[in-house]
Amino acid sequence: LMCNLLEGVVNSGTGVRLRYKYKLTNPMGGKTGTTQQHADGWFIGVTPDLVGGVWVGAEDRSIHFQNLANGQGANMALPIWAKFLQKAYADSGLKMSGRPFDRPAGISKRLDCDETISEAEAKEMNKSLREDEEEFY
């Protein structure tokens, strides 16, 4: 379930730049982060073969980026992760598979919304999902 949540960050959230700007198409997830007063930006990335993180900031807490746009993890740390991941996938010696995340046994998909919404409302909500997209809860 956690991998599914983190994939959402990369497929349609603050990490989507990995897909369109850096052309990374393999299964992956991530989480961006920014600290108070734009002092740190970070990105944690996960693939089925690799987990890593990038932190951009300073140990001296009085040093910080001038504005949120510069201090965001999606703007400062994510590009570093993207370049690293591009090189990792290009290196055949690392054997990065590009396989999907493993789905643990015992996880099932249940679409049981009738206690909170009508069947017509559920069908209308499902129209917004791409045909190949599934959400797990």
Short names for language-model regions:
Residues 1-127:
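A penicillin-recognizing enzyme superfamily signal
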Residues 125-137:
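Extended acidic low-complexity intrinsically disordered regions
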